[in-house]
């Protein structure tokens, strides 16, 4: 299974739990009084972030962002140890402080030629995952499927579904994927982290996202919903900042 904090971001505290001993270790390291989630492990290698938006009163919503995520790997050559492969890799070497500890029990192993060693479990760019802009891959069937899912959630108008899948063509057909997270108003259109995106493009996409968010917020206020007060927002923000350094190490 997968263990993760209920309150957090960028993959903080996410761990793969393979046995009862690992679960006990995770629970003992978790901050007291904080909530956590235990999820069934989804074995699919593919991961994507699907950002959905619908204004209150609209009959259907749309997908405004797709991010394809690729996990960091090194590949064996039959000569170098895993430690050497990590340190010699132009990208992984810069994040060796993350990977060496996670793979401490196998750093002296020599992977066979062509063997892929996945370096991180969490699909976060802070863990070395590569993000690619997939906005051109939206299909009507995919949009209809996510609209059905979003409209089944009471008052869900804006957010990112993080999914796992085996074949993205099936996702485009609206089939064969598993949602591992639903992120709400604090979510980000993560396609902006594609290295081919310019700073101006990233700013523009974020401003369009936040314009939609504030339009939805205004519509919901007009419908009678009370927004968080500034003090409430600060309290939640402070709580997240206090908890994040206390979570167990991220896989």
Descriptions of predicted regions:
Residues 3, 160, 179-181:
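Short hydrophobic beta-strand that contains or immediately precedes a catalytic carboxylate
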Residues 24-28, 143, 147, 204-207, ...:
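Generic detector of well-ordered alpha-helical segments enriched in charged/polar residues
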Residues 45-47, 56-63, 155-158, 172-177, ...:
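Coil-to-beta-strand transition motifs
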Residues 34, 73, 153-160, 189:
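Short secondary-structure junctions and interdomain/linker hinges
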Residues 166-251:
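C-terminal active-site "lid" helix and adjoining low-complexity regulatory extension at the edge
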Residues 50, 66, 163, 182-184:
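A structural signal for short, well-ordered beta-strand segments
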Residues 86-173, 220-247:
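A long amphipathic alpha-helix within ATP-dependent nucleotide-binding catalytic cores
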Residues 1-100, 139-143:
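Active-site nucleotide/adenylate-binding loops and adjacent lid/helix of ATP-dependent enzymes
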């Amino acid at each position: 299974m997968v263990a993760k904090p209920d309150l957090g971001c960028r993959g903080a505290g996410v761990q793969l739990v393979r046995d009862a001993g690992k679960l006990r270790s995770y629970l003992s390291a978790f901050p007291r009084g904080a909530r956590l989630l235990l999820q069934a492990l989804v074995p699919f290698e593919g991961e994507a972030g699907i950002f959905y938006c619908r204004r209150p009163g609209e009959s259907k919503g749309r997908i405004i962002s797709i991010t394809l995520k690729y996990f960091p790997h090194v590949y064996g050559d039959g000569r170098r140890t895993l430690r050497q492969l990590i340190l010699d890799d132009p990208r992984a070497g810069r994040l060796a402080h993350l990977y060496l500890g996670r793979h401490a029990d196998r750093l002296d192993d020599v992977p066979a030629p062509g063997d892929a060693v996945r370096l991180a479990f969490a699909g976060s760019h802070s863990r070395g995952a590569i993000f690619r802009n997939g906005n051109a891959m939206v299909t009507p069937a995919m949009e209809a499927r996510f609209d059905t899912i979003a409209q089944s959630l009471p008052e869900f108008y804006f957010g990112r579904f993080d999914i796992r899948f085996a074949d993205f063509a099936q996702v485009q057909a609206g089939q064969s994927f598993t949602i591992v997270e639903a992120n709400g108003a604090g979510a980000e259109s993560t396609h902006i982290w594609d290295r081919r995106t310019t700073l101006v493009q990233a700013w523009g996409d974020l401003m369009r996202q936040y314009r939609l968010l504030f339009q939805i917020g205004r519509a919901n206020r007009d419908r009678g919903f009370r927004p968080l007060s500034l003090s409430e927002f600060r309290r939640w923000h402070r709580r997240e900042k206090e908890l994040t350094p206390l979570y167990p190490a991220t896989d």
